[in-house]
A protein has these predicted regions:
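Ser/Thr/Gly/Pro-rich low-complexity, disordered linker/stalk segments of secreted
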Residues: 92-114
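GGW-centered surface loops in extracellular recognition modules
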Residues: 107-197, 331
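Short aromatic-cysteine micro-motif
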Residues: 178-181, 209-379
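Aliphatic-rich helix starts adjacent to a transmembrane/signal segment
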Residues: 51-76
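N-terminal leader/signal peptides at the extreme start of proteins
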Residues: 1-27, 105
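C-terminal, surface-exposed recognition/capping segments
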Residues: 337-340, 362-447
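Short extracytoplasmic
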Residues: 72-91
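N-terminal single-pass transmembrane signal-anchor helix
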Residues: 27-50
Length: 447
């Protein structure tokens, strides 16, 4: 190989080395750029995903916007419907659901679509029906019952609160079963709206009363009714409790003695709070000898039973009326929540603020005959002692008295009235005392 060829060969080798160095450098730069690009893309992707899927992301905002649009549309439809009902009530005298309409009181100009109680008087409803009085106070009429009209005959329902004989919750609205004629009175709980734009609050609960005078010792219940606390044991006057679990009771007189308790205390409380009230029998119970069921009717002989049988009879009066396996309404013996809260209702709206301390008995008489009618409810302050589902822990020597009666009574042996509406008295599980029968009063609660 000559000199010229050697020179060319060396140049070629040098160029190859240089090319390899340049290629390596370019490859390193490209890889770095690629890594940087990927990192940037990942960062941007994270930002983008966060912008899309985060709590305040695009999708969430879009959903919120759609929900707000849907709610605005529904509000518009509701407003149009209310306006239509209001116009219809002014032009045709009724609401869109076929019942007399009108505004509620208290400054609320939004028309109510709830039927007025006044339009349903005398009509047996074919389902549980919510209705309201002129002041916007709601009741629930059970299926198969009707609201009684104001009357002037003995034993009639009377409505005087509004001054026009139209039923108002403050009067004690009377319902009657369309088949058997049994009567009950609505006892409201919660906030009640009055005709002068004031309100009163009646709290469902067990209250304490002075054992000597019968007077209410505190407007705050000793046990406020709630589903959460109904299982708690709260003792009044050292011996009186309302047990939450059902038991049938027995007639024992020793330490095994038990009273019969409420059918389903939690259900009574939950339905009462949800509906804003419950029904208490208008009269002390009598007994139909043909059907062997108790009744709540005017001018009937008061039934005498043991506490255990009183609970059984009250439960079986209507049982648990159900449709599609869902409760419509149920009957039970009055419990201490119902008895005490009824006293509060009557003292608030009857004009007799000392009702808890009264006994109006002048004789032992048939149901509704004594002058003892307040808020359309008869004889709670007198006539017969009345069994409740309340429990007594009292014992004397070896005798136990697990049952509790309430109210005043008239003694047939000496012709005098004893005790008063709020009185609690422990008793054994007997049918009759030496001075008169032990009566009962059922209640209804509506789903």
């Amino acid at each position: 190989m000559n000199k010229k060829e050697n020179k060319i060969s060396k140049e070629i080798k040098i160029n190859k080395k240089s090319a390899r160095r340049n290629y390596s450098n370019q490859t390193g730069i490209t890889l770095i750029a690629l890594v940087v690009t990927i990192v940037v893309l990942l960062i941007l992707a994270g930002v983008s995903l966060n912008a899309i899927f985060s709590e305040n992301g695009i999708i969430k905002r879009a959903k919120d916007a759609q929900n707000k649009m849907d709610q605005a549309t529904q509000n518009d439809l509701d407003a149009i419907n209310d306006l239509s009902n209001w116009i219809d009530s002014k032009t045709n005298g009724n609401t869109g659901d076929g019942s007399t309409g009108g505004n509620t009181t208290g400054g609320n100009d939004k028309p109510s679509t709830t039927p007025k109680i006044s339009t349903l008087v005398g009509t047996v409803v074919d389902k549980n029906t919510k209705a309201e009085d002129a002041y916007g106070n709601k009741i629930t009429i059970p299926k198969g019952f009707k609201v009684l009209a104001h009357g002037t005959e003995a034993g009639s329902a009377t409505y005087t609160y509004s001054g026009d004989n139209i039923p108002a919750v403050q009067d004690g609205i009377v319902i009657e079963n369309g088949t058997d004629g049994n009567q009950f009175v609505w006892v409201p709980v919660g906030t009640i709206k009055n005709k002068d734009n004031t309100t009163n609050t009646i709290t469902l609960g067990r209250y304490e009363f002075d054992s000597n005078t019968g007077a209410l010792t505190s407007t705050t219940p000793a046990q406020v009714a709630s589903v959460e606390n109904c299982t708690q044991t709260v003792t009044i006057d050292g011996k009186f409790q309302e047990l939450s679990s059902f038991r049938p009771g027995n007639t024992a007189t020793d330490s095994t003695a038990q009273n019969a308790t409420a059918r389903n205390l939690e259900e009574f409380i939950s339905t009462t709070l949800a509906n804003g009230g419950y029904y208490i029998a208008r009269f002390e119970a009598s007994e139909n000898k043909t059907t062997n069921k108790i009744e709540s009717k005017y001018n009937q002989t008061v039934a005498g039973k043991t506490q255990q049988n009183a609970v059984k009879a009250a439960r079986e009066m209507y049982g648990e009326v159900k449709e599609n396996n869902k409760l419509v309404y149920a009957s039970d013996l009055v419990n201490s929540y119902a008895w005490d809260t009824t006293i509060i209702f009557i003292q608030t709206y009857s004009g007799t603020s000392n009702y808890a301390s009264l006994n109006k008995s002048t004789s032992f008489a048939k149901s509704g005959i004594n002058n003892d009618k307040y808020c359309n409810i008869w004889d709670m302050s007198g006539n017969a002692f009345e069994w409740t589902t309340e429990y007594s822990t009292h014992s004397l020597d070896s005798f136990f008295y697990p049952c509790v009666t309430r109210g005043g009574y008239y003694r047939t042996d000496d012709g005098n009235a004893y005790r008063c509406t709020s009185s609690r008295l422990f008793n054994g599980n007997v049918t009759i005392l030496a001075h008169g029968p032990l009566g009962l009063r059922p209640l209804l609660y509506v789903k």
